[in-house]
A protein has these predicted regions:
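Bacterial N-terminal signal peptides
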Residues: 5-17
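ATP/nucleoside-binding phosphotransfer catalytic cores, i.e., glycine-rich phosphate-binding loops
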Residues: 269-342
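Internal helical hairpin/lid segments
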Residues: 225-284
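A short helix->loop->beta-strand "cap" motif at the edges of active sites that frequently abuts
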Residues: 101, 127-132, 152, 262-263, ...
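ATP/NTP phosphate-donor binding region
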Residues: 24-101
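Conserved anion/nucleotide-ligand pocket segment
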Residues: 152-216
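Short, acidic/small-residue loops that bind anionic groups at enzyme active sites
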Residues: 123-145, 153-159
């Protein structure tokens, strides 16, 4: 074989090896450490304000699990409907990630405001101090930015507000408690008793778990913080949205290309979305199935995440497999831990 041909083959081989390694590196996320008894959980308010007098029972619950609680200044602040200025709320996040005393960060509540602080976060500094970061709803903006910019695993799960009125199930508390301590089961994700995942579009997919609140993800499209989602298993939830609003938001994700980039779609709780729909209107299931089929992706529904009493402690940025069977049954399996190796 001519020397030129050999050189060309070697060059092509090196290119593919580099590309594969680069793609793997791009997908890898920094993992986090579990909590030990006596560790400190930092509570901050990156979005809407809250009345801390309403959170006494929730703080007592964290302390009953064996943890200390440190409150960020933002939980006591107010600026319109926000928990202080954008600068104040961003500073709390930057400070807590670099505070060695704080071993995990729990968001107070959602609402609105997380997207406003994304340009103010020090992603390089945060990336050097990965730790459990937990929340959902509006916190989706932070999960997405921390995954894309700081390349770290985060947790889509209950916030302090989830525990303030005892409006949660034993399922939610059990997985939250075991998720914090590192006893969370790896393998097939559990479902609340009497419930099951249901196939909308059969098929299988493997990729990073990513996603969150549908409204927030759609609002990030076209910004520097939008979810890339290449090969991901995308999960979605929302609350107080009608079927036509879900349709509009899903169309935005479709036209953005996100639904084409992911490998599978998982629908969580959509909070009574069908209420008020007129006879003959598309159902939520119709809309969910339409977009999954249009994108050519396997899809399931009834995933226990979102604004409901059952809310999984779900690691984002780790490999998982979605299996949606022809008989209507389905499973989601975590293929790796969200925790650092010892």
């Amino acid at each position: 074989m001519a020397a030129g041909a050999i050189a060309l083959i070697l060059a092509i081989l090196c290119y593919f090896l580099f590309s594969t390694a680069h793609a793997h590196e791009a997908q890898s996320r920094s993992k986090v450490s579990p909590l030990k008894e006596g560790d400190t959980i930092g509570v901050l308010a990156p979005a809407a304000k809250g009345n801390m007098a309403e959170y006494t029972e929730a703080i007592d619950l964290l302390e009953s699990l064996g943890y200390q609680v440190k409150l960020a200044p933002s939980v006591h602040k107010s600026a319109g409907y926000l928990a202080g200025s954008d600068e104040d709320r961003a500073k709390d996040i930057n400070d807590f990630f670099q505070d060695d005393e704080v071993k995990a960060i729990l968001c107070l509540r959602g609402g609105y405001g997380s997207a406003r602080i994304l340009p103010l976060l020090d992603y390089d500094a945060i990336a050097k101090h990965p730790k459990l970061f937990i929340g959902f709803s509006d916190i989706t903006a932070l999960h997405t930015a921390l995954g894309e910019k700081a390349h770290m695993v985060t947790i889509h799960g209950p916030m302090l507000s989830s525990f303030k009125n005892f409006d949660y199930t034993a399922f939610t508390l059990y997985l939250f408690e075991n998720g914090l301590s590192g006893s969370y089961p790896i393998g097939k994700l559990p479902m609340p008793e009497g419930t099951s995942l249901t196939t909308l579009v059969p098929g299988s997919a493997t990729g990073l778990l990513e996603g969150g609140n549908l409204t927030v993800l759609a609002s990030l499209c076209g910004t520097p913080y939008e979810l890339k989602g290449d090969g991901a298993i995308l999960f979605l939830e929302d609350v107080r949205v009608s079927p036509y609003e879900i349709d509009r938001l899903m169309e935005q994700l479709y036209q953005n290309g996100l639904l084409s980039r992911v490998s599978g779609i998982v629908y969580g709780d959509f909070g009574r979305a069908q209420a008020g729909a007129a006879e003959g209107d598309f159902s939520v299931d119709d809309i969910m199935t339409h977009y999954a089929k249009q994108a050519g992706k396997p899809a399931v529904k009834n995933f226990p995440i979102g604004h409901a009493a059952n809310n999984l402690f779900l690691p984002l940025g780790i490999q998982a497999t979605l299996q949606a069977n022809e008989d209507g049954t389905a499973t989601i399996t975590l293929n790796e831990s969200y925790l650092k190796s010892n």
